[in-house]
Amino acid sequence: MAKYNNNSNASKATNLKQQVVLPTYTLDSNLVLLPGIMYNVTFSRFKAAALLYRYKNFISQVSIINNLLNEYDFNSGNTNEEERFEAEQKLEQPETYHEINPSVISPEAVEGIKEFFQYETGMKTGRGVEKGVKSTQNDAIKEFDWLTLAIIPNLEKIKNPETNSSAGDGSSSSKVVTVARIVGIVDDTTNIKLTLQAITRGVQIKDDGKNNHHKRGLKTNEQVIGIDWNHNVSDLKGKFTTLQKNYQQLFQSIDKFLIDYREALDYNKNNSNNNNNNNNNRNGNLSLIKGNSTTYSNNKNYDDKPNQDIKSQNLLTLNPLANALYMQLVGSKDFNKAFHRLQKLFSQVIQGDEYKIDNETYLRLVDLTCGILPFPNFQKLALLNEYKLDDRSILINEMMSQLIQIFGNLQTNTSFVNSWFHSEATNIQKATVVANQLKSIRNLLEGMTKNRPIKPNKRNSGPASSAPSFSNGKTPPARPKVNHHQDGSHGHDSDYDNNDDDDDGDEDLKAIFNFIKHKLPTISSLSADSKRLILKDFKRVKASANSPGGGGNSDFHVLRNYLEIVMDIPWDNYVTKFKSNKDIDLKLAKKQLDDDHYGLEHVKKRLIQYLVVLKLLGINAEKDQALQSKDEENSKNPAHSDSNSNSNCNSNSRSLTKSPTSSLASKTPSSIVIANNDETYLAKQQAKTRNQKSITEAKTNVSTKMVPSNESIQVSKNNKSPIIMLAGPPGTGKTSLAKSIASALGRNFQRISLGGIKDESEIRGHRRTYVGAMPGLLIQALRKSRCMNPVILLDEIDKVIGGNSGGVNKFNGDPSAALLEVLDPEQNNTFIDHYLGFPVDLSQVIFICTANDPWNMTRPLLDRLEMIEIGAYDYNEKLIIGKKYLLPRQIKRNGFPVTKVGKNNTGNQDEFIKINDDTMKKVILDYTRGEAGVRNFERRLGTLCRFKAVEYCEWLNKDIKNYNPIIDENDLPIYLGVPYSSGDVTTEGTVGVGVVHGLSYNSDGSGSVLVFESIGFDRRISNGNKEHNGGDGSGGNGATLNMTGRLGEVLMESGKIGLVFIKSMIYKNILKFDNNNNNNTNRHLLLDKYNNLDIHMHVPMGSVSKDGPSAGVTMALSFLSVLLDKPVPSDIAMTGEITLRGIVLPIGGVKEKLMGAHLNANIKRMIVPRENRKDLIKEYSRSIEEAGEVLDHHLINDLIKDNEDNEFKLTQVEDYYQNKYGISLFYAKEFYDIIKIVWNEDEVLLKENNSRLLEYHI
C-alpha cells in the first residue's frame, strides 16, 4: 500500500493566499490550460511580438525575442494600420486593442510577478512561503521567469453540446484563469511557437479601488489575480483510492478499445487466427495493461468471447464515436508520450510502501488526467473552474465514470451490430446498410464543401486593397477594378491565384501553395523571370498531383522537393542588432569585439569602418528619401495630392515594419498536448487583404529602385559587404573572431568547412537532373541562418583541392574557381546555384575566410580577398589572453560555481583557482613552447582546472580537510608532468669556428633559432704538402660543399650562392688572411686554401625539414668563418637572403623570428635586412595600439620618412624592442655590413681596398 501524507510543505506557511497584479491574455482558440502541463501554442509573428513586447524591459538578453521585436515598431502609432483594421473587423472586442498597439507592463504588474515568483519558489523548495520570500528577495529573476501572465480561456469558442451554447453565455461565467509562464520560443520563420507552462489557478478579482495596493496604475490588459496556494485535501486516502479505481477501469477500457479497433483496421492484412496476445505487440500500440484485457469496463452486458468470424469482421470502424475516440487517442505522437507519462505517474504512486502520495501529487494527477485524456474542452473548462479542492475531486471522478460508461456502451452497441450484421441480416439488408453508410459519407462531404468559407474578392476586399501601391509609392490612375490588371504586360492575377479549391489539394502542397500565392509576389530580391520559372514549376507540380496515379511519378517528387527548398530560403529577411542603420552604436560594437578578443586592432578597425559606412548610408538614405518624397509631392497634380499623400503615408508606414504576409505558415503539429493553430488566423486574414497589392508590385515594372520593406533591419544595397580573409597560423583565434564579428553585428553565423572539398558542385549545387540533387553549401547556409545577410565563415579556404593545390579531377570541376563568383563583390549579387537555376543575391552576406598558408591559393581568388594577416602571439600577449579569457572560461567549463560579477566578469574565480603571472608564464614557455596561437595553452589550463576540480570535489565530500585554490610553479610537474626540452641545447656552448645562429619561421607560425655548423678540411694536410705550389693558389680542385640536416632545395641553393660569393671576395682581394704578407700574397694564400677546402655543413634537429632562402647570410658567414678560422660570437642571430653580389634581401616573419630570438637566453643581438625595418615600424605601431596606448601618428610619419635615408636617426623602434625583448637590432643592406657587425672591420677587410667596396654597393 502507498503511504499518504496530509501535512504538505505548504501547510507550514502562515499565509497561503495572495493577490497580485498580473498581465492577462485571452486566447483566440478554444484551448483550456490546466496546471501542471506544458502547452505548445502557435502564434502569428505579429501576435507573438505584441505579447512579448510587454516584457521588453526584462528580456533584452534573449536574442530570438529581440530579433522578433525588431520586425515591428510598436513605439510609433502609424505602423500598424492594417493590423488595427483587421483586428477591429475580426475580433470586435475592446479588450483586444492592446494587441494592436501594446504597451509594457505597469510597475504594479512587475511587483506582482516578483511576488508570485517568491511564493512559487517557496512552495517548490519546500521551505514555506515566508522563507521562500526571504530567500528570493535578493536573487535576480531570470529572463524567462518574467514572462508570467494570466491566461483567460476564450469562453465564446468553447461550446457545450448539451446546451448548444458557448461557455460564456449566461451570467455564471467563470472568473478562473490559468497562471502560466512562457518557458520556450521557436521561430520557424512563418509563425512563432511559444511553450506555455501552466503553473496554477487564479481568480480574477474586481479592483474597486478600496485596495490601496492596487488602486491605480493598472492597464487594460492587467488584472488583480487571487491565488490560493493551500493544497490540503481532506480525506486524501479516500479520494486517491477512488481516483485510482476509476483510472484502472478507464485505462483497461481504453486499452481494450484500441486492441479491437486495430483488429478491425488490420482485417485485410492479418490472418483471422491471430489472437489478442499478438495484437498487443504491434508497433504503435498504446497498451496500458500488461497481459490481455477482455472488457472495456466492468459492464458485462455483452459477450466477452464473441465468435471469431464476428470479431475478425468488426464493424467498429464504421462508428463515428469510435473513429473520434481513436483519433484523439492515437492521433499524435505527443499524445502517446503524454499518455504513457500519465500511466507512469500513477504506477509510481501505487508501487511500494516507501513512496508517499502527498496533496500536491494528488492534485497534479487530477489535472493531468483531465488534460491528457480525451475529455471535451467544456469539461476541461468545468474542472478549471472548480476552485475548491473537494469539488474538483468529485468532478474528475464523475468525468472518468462518464467516459468509462461511453466505452462500455460503445462495446455493447458494437457487439449487437456485429451479431446482427453477420448472423441475422440478409444480403439485401447488408447491402442497404453499406449503401446508407456511403450516402451519409457523401452528404457529409457535400456539406463540408458548401460550408467552406467563401474566398473574399481580393479586388473588393476593403480599404487595404482598394488602392494598391506600386513599388515607387505612386498610385495608378483610377480605373474599373474588374479590369485592374488586364494590361497584359505581366500576365493576370490568375498566375498567382487561379485555384479556388486549394483546400482540396494534397496536404503536402498547402504550404507551397501559400508561398506561391502570398509570399512569392512580395519578394523584392527575385526578378520577374525568376518568379515566372518558379510559378511554372509549381504548375507542373499541380498537374502531376492531379494526374492519374496522383503524385506517384518521380518528376512530381523532384519538383516538390525543389519548391520546398525554394520556399525554405529566407527571402527578404535581414537580421541585424541595431534598430536602423543610422542608429548603429559604434561604441557598443567596439566593446563587443574587445570583450571577445584581445588585440587584433587591425581586424577590429576594418569592421568598425564597415559599420561607419552603413551608418552614414542610413543617414544619407533618410535625407534622400525625404527630398525625393518632397519633389514627387510638388510634381503631382494638386487635385490628387490629398489621396496620393495618404497613399504614400500608408506605403511608408508599411515599409517600416515587416509585412505579416511573410508570416503565413502551414499548420504545425502539436508538440506536447495540444498545439493551438487558430492563433495564426489574424495573420492569414491580413495576408488575404494585401495579396492584390503584393501581386501588383511584383508584376509591375514601373520602377527599378528597390524600396526596403523594413528599414530597421535591411541594409543598404549600395554598400557591398566586406570579404575578408584572416591569414595566420593555427590557434590565433581566426574562427572565434568570425563568431565575434557576427555577435557584434547582431547577425546569424554559419560556418562552412572547405578543407578537402574537390567537387565544384559542393559550392554551386547539383543540377536537378541528378538523383538526390541538393543546393550548394552557400544556399544551405542561408537556409540554416534564416536570413539573407548572415556572417558566413569559409574555413580553411587554402585547403580547397584545386587551383594551385594540384591533384584535382577535371571531371569534378575546380571548386576554387567556383568561389571566384561568390567572393567577388561585383558578381555575387547574381550568384546562380545550379540547383535553383536563378540568381540569388549574396551581396549582403559578410564572407570571412580563414587560411594558414594563403599563398597556396590561386592568384585570381587571392586578388578578390581583403587579406588581413594575424601573426603569432608573444608570451606577454598570451599571458593577458590566458588571464582575461582562457582561464575564466576553463574554470566555468569544468563545473566551478563562478558568479559573473566585476569588471571582467571573473567573479569569485579566485576562490576556486588562482594562478599568478610567473606560473602562467612558465606554462607558456615550458609546456607550450613554440606555439604561435593559444590552443595548446588553453588545453594546459584545462588540465590544471580538471585536477583542481577533483580536489574541490574531494573537499566537498570531506575526503580532504582543506582546499587550496593556488597553483604555483612547484605544482606544474605534478599536474602537467615534465616540461618539454627547451630547444636551446644546440645553441649552448662556447664560441666556435663555423658555428652561426640563424632564425627560422616554423610551419606552425612560430619563430626559433637554428644553428648552422660548418667544418672545413684542408686537403693539403692529408697530402702532406701544405705549401703546395709556393702558395700561388693554383693547386687544388676547388672547395667542395656537403650539407646535411634534411635541407630543402631552396636552402641548399642559398648555401651554394653564399660559397660562390665568398670565392668572389677572395678574387677581388677584399679579405685579410695574414697581416705579415702583402696583398697579392694574401689573395694567393686564401685562394689556395679555398681550392683545397672540403666543407661540411649541418643543421641540427635533422628530423625537421628546413627550407627557404632566409638563411643565405647565415650560411655565407659560416663558410667565411671556416675559411678565415675566425669564431662568430654566440650572442648574435641573423636572417636574410643573399645574392651573388652580396646584397641582403628582405624576408618574411620578422616578428616571429624576433620572438624566437627573445625566447633563447643566449641571443642578445639580431641582424635583419635593412628593408625589413619598415615591417618593424608597422609592428611597432600595431603593438602600441593593442596595448591600449595612444598612438602618435606624427611620430609614425616621421619614422617612415626617416627610414628612407640610408642612415636613419630616429631609434624609437629599436629602443622599444630593446626594452620589451632585450634584443639589440642591427640592419644589413649587404653582406659587408654583417662582417662589420660581427667582427672588427680592420681584422677582416683590407683597408687599401675599402674604396673598392663602393663598386659592389647598391
Curated annotation (Swiss-Prot):
Residues 270-296, 447-503, 627-670 are annotated as: Disordered. One of its GO terms (biological process) is protein targeting to peroxisome. Residues 270-285, 641-655 have a biased composition (Low complexity). One of its GO terms (cellular component) is peroxisomal matrix. HAMAP family: lonp2_euk. PANTHER family: ATP DEPENDENT LON PROTEASE FAMILY MEMBER. This is Lon protease homolog 2, peroxisomal.
